[in-house]
Amino acid sequence: MIIDTTYLLPLARIGVDTDLLKDIAEKRVRIRFEDIAVNEISVFELQAKAAKLRIPPRHVVEAVEAIHKTFRVEPFHKPEIIEVSFKLRKTIQDYIDCIILATAITLKEDLITEDTLIIKNRQKIKENYRINILSYKEITE
């Protein structure tokens, strides 16, 4: 299972309405931390959002360490991820989202995201790549 950056933000004390990691810790969903992978680009994106919001660096360092300790972290520079991400640019404009989606596709793992464009194209993605796109709401129902 690949998770989008949104779900990592609470680790850096950035508030979101979709605290999936808290739900996992409290066993409100059937996902385990060891089943989750993220792309390294999500770690960068978390740092960038935290810097923009002026989150104290120590909280960001703690978040990054927790991510690397808890989840499988996939590099964004793998050739197959790059190739798939370039193909996805025809549909998804945000290149970081392309990388995250390409990670799910190349690993053949489902993606949990709140990205409206990815969710809008979920049927096409499922038909072409045989992975499911899920939202927080769908996971927690």
Task: List PLM regions with ranges.
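Short, well-structured N-terminal submotif of metal-dependent ribonuclease cores
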Residues: 1-38, 50-62, 140
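Alpha-helix capping/helix-boundary segments
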Residues: 7-8, 42, 80-81, 99-100, ...
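Residue-level signal for well-ordered alpha-helical positions
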Residues: 14-15, 49, 88, 124-125
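Acidic catalytic patch
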Residues: 37-41, 63-90
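Acidic, PIN/NYN-like endoribonuclease modules and their adjacent C-terminal/linker elements
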Residues: 70, 74, 105-141
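Acidic, metal-associated active-site segment
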Residues: 94-110
